[in-house]
């Protein structure tokens, strides 16, 4: 078999020791040459059309080359010993190869290894991707280099390019990438324009404000991302992947023949969307058939494989079962790659994504597949052993036949059990195939039952050739077949070969009684050579042998015309050629018995074809049709032609598919009979399902459609879980899982897929006693149901199907039993316990990599809990996605003196390292890991933080901020690259009164006070709320009377920040309205402002209190106007649409709200749980609260307990939960009748249904926040349309000039009374030369000025105070520094002359404007306001710790109190709180036992300001008194 580029392995080390050429007599036996190596040869590659071969020794990092097909070997000595890190062959030039090192100097050859030249990349190889080099299909000199630049522990991927084959140093293409590709990445793909084919590049680009893959975008450039001649903007654009709009979440690009595929993902799901183009201009989303007969056709991450496709269609295999014992379905696309039809069900796959599928080389329409015969049993139970059968098709998958040897069926080992390199069965040798298989009903064991079979008629018939499993190869276009027995031992001493298509075989001993364990048998890619390479392992050292085998001496003669035959790919019983894919196909081939060799090295056989007339065999079922009883029957909606039925009525008709189509690639000649038989037929518009047309429009009714479901139960509370779908989800359903319950009893579990229109109890769950419902933290399609025993039931498809596994232990009592990985859906951690007796239990942690099918114990016992902290989102060197952090006892015993330690592992507990001792708790929040350690002597806490989960640094609080006894830390939402840490500063015993919120620097180690006297409750929850969807906006309630007696009631006031805590302000009062006058009017001050009820008064901690992530800037809250917050019973309902700048009262009293259609629908209702009132009506607004209408939903007043909708705010459906005279009910309210069409975005403001809205900053008139102004799409209030689910509200960002707000005080500096950063007395500035060590590519550094740039800012230009000081050269860059700062004669003249000319004017200006601040650096253009004493950087000092520690990934977690907060039933284990950990808090400290019940998590885990929250997953108290009732 040939070594293909796609199957190249990594590099390996080898030291050549000796070689022994052994000649054989002519016409007697082959010639052998052997060479010994110490290490295994890897990445074995032939230069195409040559005898030159090279391999890599991965152990010693060397490359070896042979120019005579392995007879002699030499190390490539142009590369220093031990420096060859990676070997890469050029994909489109047979003379070129590249050896990459770990540094920035690499090596290339353009003459098949005869000479090697150095080239510079300037950047390191990327650690995050294997595809470093990307080649251009037309121009071999055009190459992309995917590398990275690291600053400390923070790494950014960077792409470079060359257009001269690295003859000159590579140039930077773009930063912040996740891989770049040439558009012209295959011979067949073209953009349709020569200049675009040459230059067009596609890059996956990471969002500047978000590390998450769900925010990555595809950007295209035709000038290498440079600026154009007439603009300073970079020339790049984002293509409209989804017809008329771009799509974010791009994760990968693949070029398959003439198609380019882009895969996207989104939050809440691992389902992917595939977008396909034939020219990078017009894109389509790949559409798969409707699910039927248990076939799940969703394309999931790491669950689909692009197979070897044809020039006219794409073939993809999609995994449809559990990963531990996978099966799949193979699909084939239409000619433009858009619509896929099911081709082969129940394909055999393995855990690595390999599929038992292979096309027969050179013969159109013939391929072999392995299917799972007992697929139903395997789908039901993952431990069932597969019964695999082999089949072959000769019509591109329309029909399949058994593989037979004589009259017996045989089954063949295929791609999932690769035992050699290259294709499994076939080669360019026409019609010749070899395989390992067995006779019987299904495929058996390779080693015990496998034999070698040969076919010389393209797989129609097979003959047994040799007993036992063998590695095999083809030579001289099939004139010679070579095989070597496969073995697990070093006991193989001979090879076998055949010169007559496998009818007879000759054995030949290896030289010098050599015995090997074979690893690879290979030859040139064309299979036209008479030379082969055999690689095997031997017992003695050196351990590896590379054996060159030459058969050139067996025949002297070269084949003549009489020795050849015309071989037809398909013949009938009489031997006459038959049509295959619409034509006959024949090849010239050497006759079996001819005693000659073709000796046409490096040439491919050429076929001859002749078209036939079309028959029924040339047609297959069209999209969404499947064959039943010989006919194609509809299994899903019809796809209409472009534009059809867009404005039609359901009964209108059009010409649509008959259900049949000609097989793609079939070349048969059309006939009138076949045309008439399969022509388009009349179809109704009601049958369609998208495509180029559109569903018939439904006129707006301007009415709310409502559907009630009454439950004959005695429930008094609900548990409900919204399964938020992702943007890439193919399903449009809105799924909710719920159950009613009483104080002592759990009700049955109900599921709806249409937002409460219909409910059903899943059969799989009916008989189970389920105590917890736990949605997957990151992938909302997956939900776990924990029973009273060890049985865990789960669904991966939003409740359509169910599976189960056995938990390794009982769940822990005080932590969430399941921990999830943010990128790997099937990676699970089980936090369990083992009990020696009822009162003698200890923690045990287990992990699974296949969704619970198999479990292994993680580390030692007495482990309290573990969680995944690895993530693709945060890129740091050495960071592994397998990283796990655990809290465990230092000793494996119940000893009293047995403190907790924090351990980490990167290899599934094979190795563990203690990171911190005396640990009270740890929390993950965005990229940070925050740990609270305990000082046992004085019983206080110390916080420390890490970015990589390995190196922790103590948190340094601001100079002058002293808390005598630190007992409680609460980690708040930290989604803007800084930790928000609440430190309790006033305690009443162990109960929290109030404290300060401190904000960290970018590595979480040094803090500045953001706001003080913040209210907290007895559980250490804090009145702090980030506003969903906006960067840097948050609300707090502060205690206005901190000096009052402890028995005095707190006087709370509300403050808001619009710049992430740098400045806080009171809320302005609303204007007086029809309801009445307010007691005072003010723009917001301590005596008169609007005050809102906050987080500590919330019953459901996970709920979004004020806002919805997609209704940007819209907030609703309860509160009052005055000097402080009053009782909630006296509060009214207020609303803002400008992110809190202005407010208005919308209802008197406390009304519960829900926001839908991304702010287009707002519903208010009085709920019994809040106001103790019954009702029969609600009010709603369709214009963002400008006007309100009343809707009566019941004839009699009922109790309404809640109103809910999707947390994304994207739905037009709402659900009322309540209780009437007939019992508990749900009432679905459908608002779709108020709109007809999807809102459209248009560059023309008059045509667009949206306008651009930017949040304003109350203290910054330019509206800049973090150096930019954000623009959001908002629907115009007068437009009668609805927001598409896939609308991205954030439309764009515009950078601002740098001002004072973009800089903070540097290390050991603090703000002085003049508002300037001054050195803290007694401290020293940081060593400025450390900058060079952290940034090795920089050539200079500045002396400290006292200022540094805020990491989050994107500002450009303006003042740069961190650089307004003397500059010095970095060590080793002195020459570069001198060149950069060399002064020309003209510049010197002006430098001397101009200061004298300006001295008088400057002196006059200084005299006129002197304000006593001379000698200090002053920033910005705002004047004195910049330095006012009430600015936070004046009031609070800032001290910045040098970045000696950094760390990686922190992920939201659901633990402790959240687990217990939903318990309290059935032994304290009630409905679980799942969700995604957003909007939660992490509390460090408090009671004993590692924090106990008072440790919770609260993290939006947001992406650049998209502050989402958890699902409504906690048990909700209904119909009885609670802390929210007044």
UniProtKB/Swiss-Prot annotation:
Membrane topology designation: Multi-pass membrane protein
Main localization, broad class: Golgi
Cell location: Golgi apparatus, trans-Golgi network membrane; Prevacuolar compartment membrane
Positions annotated as BNR repeat: 64-74, 107-118, 453-463, 497-507, 793-803, 847-856, 1134-1144, 1180-1189
Bias kind Gly residues: ranges: 1484-1493
UniProt cross-references to InterPro entries, sorted A to Z: Sortilin_C, Sortilin_N, VPS10, VPS10-sortilin, WD40/YVTN_repeat-like_dom_sf
Listed SUPFAM superfamilies: Oligoxyloglucan reducing end-specific cellobiohydrolase
Signal peptide per UniProt: 1-24
Residues carrying a glycan: 311, 336, 938, 1003
Cytoplasmic side: 1407-1437
Purpose of the protein: Functions as a sorting receptor in the Golgi compartment required for the intracellular sorting and delivery of soluble vacuolar proteins, like carboxypeptidase Y (CPY) and proteinase A. Executes multiple rounds of sorting by cycling between the late Golgi and a prevacuolar endosome-like compartment.
Membership in a protein family: Belongs to the VPS10-related sortilin family.
Name listed for the protein in its UniProt record: Vacuolar protein sorting/targeting protein 10
Gene: VPS10
């Amino acid at each position: 078999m040939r070594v293909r580029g796609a199957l190249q392995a990594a590099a390996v080390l080898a030291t050549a020791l000796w070689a022994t050429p052994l000649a054989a007599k002519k016409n007697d036996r082959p010639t052998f040459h052997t060479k010994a190596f110490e290490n295994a040869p890897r990445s074995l590659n032939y230069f195409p059309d040559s005898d030159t071969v090279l391999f890599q020794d991965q152990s010693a990092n060397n490359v070896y080359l042979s120019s005579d097909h392995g007879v002699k070997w030499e190390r490539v000595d142009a590369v220093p010993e031990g420096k060859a890190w990676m070997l890469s062959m050029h994909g489109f030039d047979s003379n070129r190869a590249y050896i990459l090192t770990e540094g920035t100097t690499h090596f290339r050859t353009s003459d098949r290894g005869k000479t090697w030249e150095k080239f510079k990349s300037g950047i390191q190889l990327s650690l995050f991707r294997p595809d470093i080099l990307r080649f251009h299909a037309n121009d071999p000199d055009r190459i992309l280099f995917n590398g990275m630049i690291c600053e400390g522990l923070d790494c950014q991927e960077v792409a470079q390019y060359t257009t001269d084959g690295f003859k000159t140093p590579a140039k930077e293409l773009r930063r912040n990438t996740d891989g770049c590709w040439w558009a012209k990445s295959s011979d067949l793909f073209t953009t349709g324009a020569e200049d675009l084919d040459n230059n067009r590049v596609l890059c996956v680009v990471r969002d500047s404000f978000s590390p998450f893959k769900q925010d990555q975008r595809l950007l295209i450039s035709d000038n290498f991302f440079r600026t154009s001649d007439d603009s300073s903007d970079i020339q790049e654009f984002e293509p409209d992947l989804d017809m008329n709009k771009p799509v974010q979440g791009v994760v990968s690009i693949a070029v398959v023949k003439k198609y380019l595929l882009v895969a996207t993902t989104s939050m809440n799901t691992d389902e992917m969307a595939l977008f396909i183009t034939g020219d990078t201009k017009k894109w389509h989303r790949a559409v798969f058939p409707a699910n039927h007969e248990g076939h799940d056709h969703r394309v999931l991450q790491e669950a689909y494989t692009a197979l070897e496709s044809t020039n006219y269609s794409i073939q993809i295999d999609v995994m449809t079962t559990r990963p531990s014992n996978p099966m799949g379905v193979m699909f084939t696309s239409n000619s433009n790659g858009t619509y896929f039809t099911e081709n082969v069900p129940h394909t055999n796959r393995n855990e690595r994504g390999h599929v038992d599928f292979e096309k027969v080389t050179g013969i159109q329409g013939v391929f072999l597949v392995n299917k799972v015969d007992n697929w139903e049993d395997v789908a039901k139970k993952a431990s069932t052993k597969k019964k695999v059968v082999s089949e072959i098709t000769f019509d591109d998958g329309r029909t399949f036949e058994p593989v037979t040897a004589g009259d017996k069926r045989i089954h063949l080992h295929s791609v999932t059990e690769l035992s050699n390199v290259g294709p499994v069965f076939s080669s360019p040798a026409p019609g010749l195939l070899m395989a390992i298989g067995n006779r019987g009903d299904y495929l058996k064991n390779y080693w015990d039952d496998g034999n070698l079979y040969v076919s010389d008629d393209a797989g129609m018939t097979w003959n047994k050739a040799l007993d036992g499993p063998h590695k095999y190869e083809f030579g001289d276009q099939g004139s010679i077949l070579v095989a070597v027995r496969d073995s697990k031992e070093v006991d193989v001493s001979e090879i076998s070969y055949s010169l007559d298509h496998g009818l007879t075989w000759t054995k030949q001993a290896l030289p010098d009684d050599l015995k090997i364990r074979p690893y690879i048998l290979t030859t040139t890619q064309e299979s036209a050579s008479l030379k082969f390479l055999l690689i095997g392992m031997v017992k003695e050292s050196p351990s590896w042998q590379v054996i060159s085998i030459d058969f050139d001496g067996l025949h002297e003669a070269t084949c003549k015309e009489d020795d050849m035959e015309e071989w037809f790919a398909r013949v009938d019983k009489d031997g006459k050629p038959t049509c295959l894919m619409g034509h006959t196909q024949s090849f010239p081939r050497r006759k079996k018995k001819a005693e000659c060799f073709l000796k046409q090295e490096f040439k491919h056989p050429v076929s001859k074809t002749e078209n036939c007339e079309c028959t029924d065999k040339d047609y297959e079922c069209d999209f969404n049709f499947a064959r039943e009883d010989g006919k194609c029957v509809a299994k899903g909606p019809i796809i209409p032609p472009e534009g059809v039925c867009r404005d039609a009525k359901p009964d209108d008709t059009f010409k649509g598919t008959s259900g049949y189509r000609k097989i793609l690639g079939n070349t048969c000649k059309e006939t009138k009979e076949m045309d008439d038989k399969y022509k388009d037929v009349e179809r109704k518009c009601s049958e369609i399902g998208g495509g180029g047309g559109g569903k018939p429009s439904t006129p707006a009714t301007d009415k709310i459609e409502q559907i009630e479901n009454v439950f004959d139960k005695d429930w008094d509370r609900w548990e409900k879980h919204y399964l938020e779908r992702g943007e890439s989800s193919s399903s449009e359903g809105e799924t909710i899982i719920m159950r009613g319950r009483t104080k002592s009893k759990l009700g049955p579990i109900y599921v709806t897929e249409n937002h409460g229109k219909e409910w059903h109890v899943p059969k799989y769950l009916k008989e189970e006693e389920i105590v917890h419902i736990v949605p997957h933290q990151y992938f909302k399609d997956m939900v776990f149901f924990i029973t009273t025993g060890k049985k865990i039931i789960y669904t991966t498809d939003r409740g359509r199907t169910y599976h189960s596994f056995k938990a390794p232990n009982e769940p822990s009592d005080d932590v969430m039993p399941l921990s999830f990985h943010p990128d790997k859906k099937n990676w699970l951690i089980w936090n369990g316990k083992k009990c020696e007796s009822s009162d003698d239990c200890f923690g045990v942690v287990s992990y699974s990599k296949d969704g619970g099918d198999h479990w292994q114990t993680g580390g030692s016992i007495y482990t309290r809990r573990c969680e995944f902290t690895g993530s693709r989102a945060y890129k740091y060197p050495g960071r592994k996605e397998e990283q796990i952090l655990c809290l465990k006892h230092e000793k494996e015993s119940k000893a009293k003196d047995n403190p907790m330690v924090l351990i980490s592992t990167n290899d599934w507990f094979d190795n563990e390292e203690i990171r911190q001792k005396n640990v009270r708790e740890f929390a993950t929040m965005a990229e940070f890991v925050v740990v609270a350690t305990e000082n046992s002597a004085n019983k206080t806490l110390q916080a420390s933080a890490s970015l990589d989960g390995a190196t922790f640094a103590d948190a340094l609080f601001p100079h002058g901020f002293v808390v005598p006894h630190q007992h409680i830390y609460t980690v708040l939402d930290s989604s803007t690259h800084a930790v928000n840490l609440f430190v309790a500063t006033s305690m009443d015993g162990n109960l929290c009164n109030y404290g300060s919120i401190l904000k960290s620097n970018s590595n979480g180690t040094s803090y500045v006070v953001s706001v003080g006297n913040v209210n907290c409750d007895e559980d250490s929850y804090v009145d702090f709320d980030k506003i969903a969807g906006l960067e840097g906006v948050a609300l707090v309630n502060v205690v206005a009377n901190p000096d009052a007696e402890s028995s005095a009631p707190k006087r709370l006031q509300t403050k808001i920040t619009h710049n992430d805590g740098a400045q806080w302000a009171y809320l302005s009062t609303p204007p007086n309205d029809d309801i009445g006058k307010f007691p005072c009017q003010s723009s917001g001050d301590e005596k008169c402002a609007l005050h809102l009820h906050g987080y500590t008064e919330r019953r459901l901690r996970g709920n979004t209190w004020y806002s919805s992530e997609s209704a940007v800037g819209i907030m609703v809250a309860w509160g009052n106007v005055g000097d402080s917050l009053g009782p909630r019973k006296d509060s009214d309902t207020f609303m803002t649409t400008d992110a809190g700048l202005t407010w208005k009262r919308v209802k008197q009293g406390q009304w519960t709200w829900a926001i839908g259609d991304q702010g287009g629908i707002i519903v208010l209702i009085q709920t019994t749980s809040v106001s103790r009132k019954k009702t029969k009506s609600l009010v709603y607004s369709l214009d963002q609260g400008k006007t309100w209408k009343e809707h009566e939903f019941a004839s009699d007043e009922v109790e309404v307990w809640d109103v809910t909708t999707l947390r994304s705010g994207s739905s037009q459906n709402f659900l009322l939960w309540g209780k009437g005279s007939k019992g508990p009910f749900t009432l679905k309210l459908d608002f779709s009748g108020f709109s007809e069409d999807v809102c459209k975005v248009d560059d023309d403001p008059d045509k667009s249904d949206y306008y651009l809205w930017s949040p304003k900053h109350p203290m910054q008139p330019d509206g800049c926040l973090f150096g930019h102004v954000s623009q959001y799409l908002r629907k115009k209030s007068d437009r009668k349309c609805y927001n598409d689910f896939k609308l991205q509200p954030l439309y764009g960002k515009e950078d601002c000039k740098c001002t004072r707000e973009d800089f903070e005080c540097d290390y050991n500096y603090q703000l002085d009374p003049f508002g300037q950063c001054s050195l803290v007395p007694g401290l020293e500035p940081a060593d400025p030369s450390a900058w060079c060590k952290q940034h090795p590519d920089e050539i200079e550094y500045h002396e400290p000025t006292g200022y540094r740039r805020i990491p989050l800012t994107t500002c450009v230009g303006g003042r740069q105070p961190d650089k307004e000081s003397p500059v010095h050269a970095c060590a080793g860059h002195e020459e570069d520094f001198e060149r950069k700062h060399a002064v020309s004669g003209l510049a010197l003249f002006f430098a001397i002359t101009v200061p004298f000319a300006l001295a008088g004017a400057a002196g006059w200006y200084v005299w006129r404007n002197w304000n006593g601040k001379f000698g200090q650096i002053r920033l910005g253009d705002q004047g004195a306001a910049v330095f006012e004493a009430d600015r936070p950087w004046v009031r609070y000092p800032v001290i910045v710790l040098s970045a000696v520690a950094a760390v990686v990934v922190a992920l939201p977690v659901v633990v402790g109190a959240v687990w217990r907060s939903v318990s309290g039933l059935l032994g304290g284990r009630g409905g679980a709180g799942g969700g995604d950990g957003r909007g939660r808090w992490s509390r460090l400290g408090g009671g004993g036992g590692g924090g106990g019940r008072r440790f919770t998590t609260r993290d939006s885990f947001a992406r650049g300001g998209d502050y989402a929250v958890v699902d409504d997953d906690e048990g909700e108290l209904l119909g009885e008194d609670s802390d929210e009732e007044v």
